[in-house]
């Protein structure tokens, strides 16, 4: 599903040049749950942004679904993103002015899904994540754990092949963190490929693989011990 070859990302200003990723080679198969760990500033989020087609590499190759996508135009990246990738962020990234139902529905609007189908699919997602009683509430009326479950529901509403999660439990207490990890695990068991950046060794163990980055390079890539 995913393969990078000598992937490099360099950030430049007039005064300094910073190498965020240094010849990263990873291969991720369909159906895997991969946790990415490492200290702050090691390149975890940079790698996730490139894998999610939110940024371009400075060098190397990136293959997604057997296509070399590193030189794609913004329109090509956008089309590939909206049809194949779901995102879950640490800060939830919900729109405060929209209800929970409307937040979850939003990606379907970009896909031009008919109204009747949107309603059915949104309600199905809300039921799955125990959010139906909250569908007419606004994000600020929900707990952190509930907001993150809304974010996960929004990420899966388009039925993506791949979910990218950047510190999805970072703003949550342990109980709500476990809820989110349980949701991601269930999605993975149903066949969705998941790549998750985390600082937590405990949550990293939910992955079938754990990749450690340091100074922009992969230093270890080992099998995890999935939580039961």
Regions found by a protein language model. Name each.
Residues 1-213:
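ABC family nucleotide-binding domain
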């Amino acid at each position: 599903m995913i393969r990078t070859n000598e992937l490099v990302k360099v950030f430049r200003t007039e005064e300094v040049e910073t190498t965020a990723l240094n010849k990263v080679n990873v291969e991720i198969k369909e159906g895997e749950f991969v946790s990415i760990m490492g200290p702050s500033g090691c390149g975890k989020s940079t790698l996730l942004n490139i894998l999610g087609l939110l940024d371009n590499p400075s060098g190397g190759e990136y293959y997604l679904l057997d296509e070399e996508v590193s030189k794609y135009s913004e329109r090509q990246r956008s089309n590939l993103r909206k049809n194949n990738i779901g995102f879950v962020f640490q800060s939830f990234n919900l729109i405060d002015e929209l209800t929970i139902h409307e937040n979850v529905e939003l990606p379907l609007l970009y896909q031009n899904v008919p109204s009747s189908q949107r309603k059915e699919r949104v309600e199905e997602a809300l039921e799955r994540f125990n959010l139906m009683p909250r569908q007419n509430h606004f994000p600020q009326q929900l707990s952190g754990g509930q907001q993150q479950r809304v974010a996960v529901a929004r990420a899966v509403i388009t039925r993506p092949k791949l979910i990218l999660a950047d510190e999805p439990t970072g703003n949550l207490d342990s109980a709500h963190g476990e809820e989110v990890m349980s949701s991601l695990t269930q999605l993975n068991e149903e066949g969705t490929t998941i790549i998750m950046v985390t600082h937590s060794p405990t949550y990293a163990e939910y992955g079938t693989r754990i990749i450690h980055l340091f100074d922009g390079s992969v230093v270890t890539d080992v099998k995890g011990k999935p939580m039961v």
